[in-house]
């Protein structure tokens, strides 16, 4: 496997050093026991926020320059997506002011406001604009479908999604049989909406980059987890 690009390697190291990416034994919503856990809500310290905003911005710029992504507004779904989207917007303007100096951001409210400016959306109006959703991870895809529905209701056009981590993990089987092959939530969203979805890091990236940053036992357990639950897409 090729070495990680510098921004991915820097982000991975910051995530591990800052305790955002942890290794151990963690029960997920799916009831699977994962040897690693990533919590973007732990990027609350200024230096860690700098690390994640830089990684998001460089991932977005890379996708934009390759012609895979074009957008007008960065959208952060409430709640975790709000600081991620605003920080990414600011970092985009810092890294490339000529291209992104006037880029806008928006986010949604969980409950509509019935006074003042009212409505569900805070920030730039979405109508007729290409919207890039920025969030932490895609688990089952439910939250992203809700965000897409809100954007479309406001007249926006979803241009793509960028997340911090792609677990590359198959969805739980409806009958509970985890031995069956299956697609990932990210793959299902790509197929359902026909939009590009990007991740700063994938599970493959984590396994490649964690050597030397985590114990050999943690590397082995993470490799075993990938082999057991890796998606078919």
UniProtKB/Swiss-Prot annotation:
Organism: Neurospora crassa (strain ATCC 24698 / 74-OR23-1A / CBS 708.71 / DSM 1257 / FGSC 987)
Protein name: Orotate phosphoribosyltransferase
Record family assignment: Belongs to the purine/pyrimidine phosphoribosyltransferase family. PyrE subfamily.
Function: Catalyzes the transfer of a ribosyl phosphate group from 5-phosphoribose 1-diphosphate to orotate, leading to the formation of orotidine monophosphate (OMP).
Annotated binding of 5-phospho-alpha-D-ribose 1-diphosphate, by residue: 29, 79-80, 109-110, 113, 115, 135-143
Catalytic activity entry: orotidine 5'-phosphate + diphosphate = orotate + 5-phospho-alpha-D-ribose 1-diphosphate
MF annotations from Gene Ontology: orotate phosphoribosyltransferase activity
Subunit and interaction comment: Homodimer.
Record EC number: 2.4.2.10
Protein origin, superkingdom: Eukaryota
A single Gene Ontology CC term: cytoplasm
UniProt-listed GO biological process terms: 'de novo' pyrimidine nucleobase biosynthetic process; 'de novo' UMP biosynthetic process; pyrimidine nucleotide biosynthetic process; pyrimidine ribonucleoside biosynthetic process
Pathway terms, separated by semicolons: Pyrimidine metabolism; UMP biosynthesis via de novo pathway; UMP from orotate: step 1/2
UniProt-annotated binding residues for orotate: 37-38, 139, 167
UniProt enzyme class: transferase
Keywords associated with the record: Glycosyltransferase, Pyrimidine biosynthesis, Transferase
Pfam families referenced in this protein's UniProt entry, alphabetically: Pribosyltran
């Amino acid at each position: 496997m090729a070495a990680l690009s510098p921004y991915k390697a820097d982000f991975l190291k910051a995530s591990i050093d800052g305790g955002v990416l942890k290794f151990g034994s963690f029960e997920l919503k799916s009831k699977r026991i994962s040897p690693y856990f990533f919590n973007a809500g732990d990027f609350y310290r200024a230096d860690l926020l700098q690390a994640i905003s830089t990684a998001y911005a460089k991932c977005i710029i890379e996708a934009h320059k390759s012609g895979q992504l074009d957008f007008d507004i960065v959208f952060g779904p409430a709640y975790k997506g709000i600081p991620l989207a605003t920080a990414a917007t600011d970092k985009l303007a810092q890294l490339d002011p000529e291209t992104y100096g006037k880029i806008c951001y928006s986010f949604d409210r969980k409950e509509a406001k019935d006074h003042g400016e009212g409505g569900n959306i805070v920030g730039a109006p979405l109508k007729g604009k290409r919207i890039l959703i920025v969030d932490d991870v895609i688990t089952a895809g439910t939250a992203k479908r809700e965000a897409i529905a809100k954007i479309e209701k406001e007249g926006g056009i979803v241009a793509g999604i960028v997340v911090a981590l792609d677990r590359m993990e198959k969805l739980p089987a409806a009958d509970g049989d985890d031995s069956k092959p299956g697609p990932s939530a990210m793959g299902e969203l790509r197929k359902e909406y026909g939009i590009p979805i990007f991740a700063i890091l994938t599970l493959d990236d984590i396994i490649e980059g964690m050597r030397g940053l985590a114990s050999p036992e943690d590397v082995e357990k993470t490799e075993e987890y990938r082999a057991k639950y890796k998606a078919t897409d």
